[in-house]
Amino acid sequence: MSIILGIDPGSRVTGYGVIRQTGRHLEYLGSGAIRTQVEDLPTRLKRIYAGVTEIITQFQPDMFAIEQVFMAKNADSALKLGQARGTAIVAAVNHDLPVFEYAARLVKQTVVGIGSADKVQVQEMVTRILKLSDKPQADAADALAIAITHAHSIQHSLHIANSVKMTETQEKMTALLKTRYSRGRFRLKI
């Protein structure tokens, strides 16, 4: 069982979503947004840090997943987004959480099935996947989608690890059978 905190960073609105993963089952724990309406960037970053810290304290996540920075046309916006993202990551690291990063395109591909999905499609699929009665707001839905992507990544990694173990076991059994067969201990009947 793992509790995953997903973050959709922004210098004015930072979405968050928290889910619990038990095997393949995902359970919604909470979501929302940290809103920073002040004009001063350092004060906004301080509020993001305090907000993420409060969420970590409240939900006690085991893992922290965040969207990677994309290349924006406006350099100033990209820099502010990077600073907001870095602030959230520092809050996670200060609470000894492992940090995982996912590209927006991968998140959309995982949750919707299309890497170019729009926000409405992401909201709809998050609502379905987590069996929510109401659609979460856009920034919270994006954060939940990031958490869902991380949960799927964990499941995929476990599946691969189990496949590798099975393959290694099969190879060992095959080698053992070949050894016994070559020594005359086994006879194959056809």
Curated annotation (Swiss-Prot):
Pfam families: RuvC
Entry note: cofactor: Binds 2 Mg(2+) ion per subunit.
Subcellular location: Cytoplasm
GO cellular component terms, A-Z: cytoplasm; Holliday junction resolvase complex
EC number, UniProt record: 3.1.21.10
Coiled coil (UniProt feature): none
Binding site for Mg(2+) 1: D8, D139
Active site positions, chain numbering: D8, E67, D139
Primary site of residence: cytoplasm
Catalytic activity of the protein: Endonucleolytic cleavage at a junction such as a reciprocal single-stranded crossover between two homologous DNA duplexes (Holliday junction)
Biological process terms in GO annotation: DNA recombination; DNA repair
Molecular function via GO: crossover junction DNA endonuclease activity; DNA binding; magnesium ion binding
Cofactor: Mg(2+)
Keyword annotations of the record: Cytoplasm, DNA damage, DNA recombination, DNA repair, DNA-binding, Endonuclease, Hydrolase, Magnesium, Metal-binding, Nuclease
PANTHER family to which the protein is assigned, alphabetical: CROSSOVER JUNCTION ENDODEOXYRIBONUCLEASE RUVC
Subunit note: Homodimer which binds Holliday junction (HJ) DNA. The HJ becomes 2-fold symmetrical on binding to RuvC with unstacked arms; it has a different conformation from HJ DNA in complex with RuvA. In the full resolvosome a probable DNA-RuvA(4)-RuvB(12)-RuvC(2) complex forms which resolves the HJ.
NCBIfam families: ruvC (TIGR00228)
Function: The RuvA-RuvB-RuvC complex processes Holliday junction (HJ) DNA during genetic recombination and DNA repair. Endonuclease that resolves HJ intermediates. Cleaves cruciform DNA by making single-stranded nicks across the HJ at symmetrical positions within the homologous arms, yielding a 5'-phosphate and a 3'-hydroxyl group; requires a central core of homology in the junction. The consensus cleavage sequence is 5'-(A/T)TT(C/G)-3'. Cleavage occurs on the 3'-side of the TT dinucleotide at the point of strand exchange.
Name of this protein: Crossover junction endodeoxyribonuclease RuvC
Species of provenance: Haemophilus influenzae (strain PittGG)
Name of the gene: ruvC
